[in-house]
Amino acid sequence: GRGWRERPHLKLPAIALSWTLATVIFPASHLGITWWEPENAHIWGIAISQVLFVAGITVPFDVRDVNLDPSEFRTWPQRWGASSSIRIALFLLAISASGFVVFDLNWGRAAVAIAALPIVAWTVRPRKEAVYSLLLDGLLILQGSAVFWFSSIH
């Protein structure tokens, strides 16, 4: 059988939702935040913003792999081209940053989402592997670090 990464339209949401569970929902639950309670509705805003953030920084990997992925994958770059896909990724990041500003008292996530914009824009053309493995993947580590740093200055 085919794995989830080989199913059209499933790879990007699966990655974004997995990272959101690991970086928002599980930590909130671990802290005892009952994210289903109305007074904690902001957690959903943060989670949705995180899904958009992860999706936005994942699209450049599909742009990089456009000539490697089978056409059945129907990734955004295969369907709409690199430029349109990166524009969509930038839009996702902008909405993500806005959501973090509205729903998250800690500005670390918003700061990293904003910092991701020029990096993602730069990937409209193929770059060296270090751009993907260090800069884009590093944004997830930077985001966690920024959350801790911004927590310490409040």
Question: Where do the model's predicted regions map?
Answer:
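Hydrophobic alpha-helical transmembrane segments
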Residues: 33-42, 82-92, 132-135
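Helix-coil boundary and interhelical linker segments in multi-pass alpha-helical membrane proteins
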Residues: 23-48, 98-107, 148-154
